[in-house]
Amino acid sequence: LQPKSTMVSFFHTTRDLDTVKALKEQSVTGFSMHLIPRTTLAQKMDALSSQANIAGYKAVLMAASRIGIYMPLLMTAAGTIRPAKVLVIGAGVAGLQAIATAKRLGSQVEAFDVRPVVKEQVESLGAKFIEVESSDEEGVGEGGYAKETSDDYKKRQQELIHDHISKSDVVITTAL
């Protein structure tokens, strides 16, 4: 690298100390992509968010090519074919993209997330938000990310999801 240039990569600054030292000696400015914050402002440069977006989109396309029914509602001379029912578990970046893509293909979409705050985002995409009845913000952790839930919540969650999976043609899991 030329002195005073800029390097953008995935090197780990805390483990690749020799690389950091070599960059410093050449007055090279280094940006490690894994350290970019997961904020709205930095989302275009956030490698995890960009890959999650692609994963959500591709998951729906792969499902559409593999199920034995059509994604949209079809009305033909022979009758009406109901739309595919898609359940998306997890409404983060990948989940929201999966919801949007499935809706654009004409599917009937439901989504689940432990964070009740994403209900508005899910519904704004035209999907039905399914949730475990809870008196508090049980699944919401620091920074709005999901956190560990109680055993009682998990039991109710399993029952709810089991009921919806049994009625779905496609299930896409995006929750980490």
Region roles according to the model:
Residues 1-85:
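Glycine/serine-rich phosphate-binding loop and adjoining beta1-alpha1 elements at the start
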Residues 175:
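Conserved NAD(P)H cofactor-binding loop of Rossmann-fold oxidoreductase domains
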Residues 73-164:
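Glycine-rich phosphate/diphosphate-binding loop of Rossmann-like nucleotide-binding domains
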